[in-house]
């Protein structure tokens, strides 16, 4: 009933083994590792928000479609998605027959709108970007073991340079910038 960002829940939160209710009716929950086994069809699911970080390819996220969902929106870059969309940049390309949509990365969602405005108004011959990112679930709160030793350090105590696929993704959502951005 408490969230570190949003504070106390308004109203009463109730739950059972496979559902919770935050005041507007039961919401089905599952703990299934394989999306193909989630009973989307039985629950009339229209759109799955794939936010696990585990199913970031069209093939993997399409398991939700096989389980009965009509559409999948992946909240990350998604290899071979039907379409990569940044709202306000290229969302006009969405069609009813687009089944697996990638919402790109948080960095792409910040860079693409600015790049679009610049490209449309004055043009872009070449661009270079850097990113400062909040620490993620992949970085430990305390020093710990990690396959990448730089990420083994306490996240709040370290600035860790890392790579980004945002420059490539900007070319996906703004084809006129393909190959023009680096960083």
Predicted regions and their residues:
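N-terminal Rossmann-like NAD(P) cofactor-binding subdomain of oxidoreductases
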Residues: 1-141, 145-152
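Charged docking surfaces used in two-component/phosphorelay signaling
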Residues: 138-183
């Amino acid at each position: 009933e408490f969230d570190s960002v949003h504070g106390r829940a308004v109203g009463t939160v109730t739950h059972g083994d496979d559902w919770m209710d935050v005041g507007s009716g039961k919401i089905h929950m599952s703990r299934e590792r394989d999306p193909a086994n989630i009973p989307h069809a039985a629950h009339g699911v229209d759109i799955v928000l794939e936010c696990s970080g585990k199913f970031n390819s069209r093939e993997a996220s399409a398991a939700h479609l096989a389980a009965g969902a009509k559409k999948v929106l992946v909240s990350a870059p998604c290899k071979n998605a039907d379409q990569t969309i940044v709202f306000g940049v290229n969302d006009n390309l969405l069609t009813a027959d687009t089944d697996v949509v990638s919402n790109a990365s948080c960095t792409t969602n910040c860079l693409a709108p600015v790049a679009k405005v610049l490209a449309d108004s004055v043009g872009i011959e070449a661009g270079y970007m850097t990113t400062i990112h909040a620490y993620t679930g992949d970085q430990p709160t305390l020093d710990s073991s990690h396959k990448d030793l730089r990420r083994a350090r306490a996240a709040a105590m370290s600035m860790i340079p890392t790579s980004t696929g945002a420059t490539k993704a900007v070319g996906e959502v703004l084809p006129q910038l393909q190959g023009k951005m680096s960083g």
